[in-house]
Structure formats: C-alpha cells, structure tokens
C-alpha cells in the first residue's frame, strides 16, 4: 500500500507494484 512513482494509465506497473483504480501503481 505504498504509492509507486509510475502510473498505470498508459503502461503497466513495474516490478512489485500493482495497478489500482486503473490509475496509480501501489506496492505492499
């Protein structure tokens, strides 16, 4: 539940991060 630097609007999240709300990348 920590916000990652990248977003997932135009590309998928990187590494341990997952896409939330189709907008912001989060990790545990």
Curated annotation (Swiss-Prot):
Expressed in root nodules but not in seed. It comes from Clitoria ternatea (Butterfly pea). This is Cliotide T21. Keywords: Disulfide bond, Knottin, Plant defense. Probably participates in a plant defense mechanism. Not active against Gram-negative bacterium E.coli ATCC 700926 or Gram-positive bacterium S.aureus ATCC 12600 up to a concentration of 100 uM under low-salt conditions. Disulfide bonds join 4-17, 8-19, 13-25. Transmembrane segments: none annotated. The presence of a 'disulfide through disulfide knot' structurally defines this protein as a knottin. It comes from the Eukaryota.
């Amino acid at each position: 539940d920590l916000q990652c630097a990248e977003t997932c609007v135009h590309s998928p999240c990187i590494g341990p991060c997952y896409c939330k709300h189709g907008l912001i990348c989060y990790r545990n």
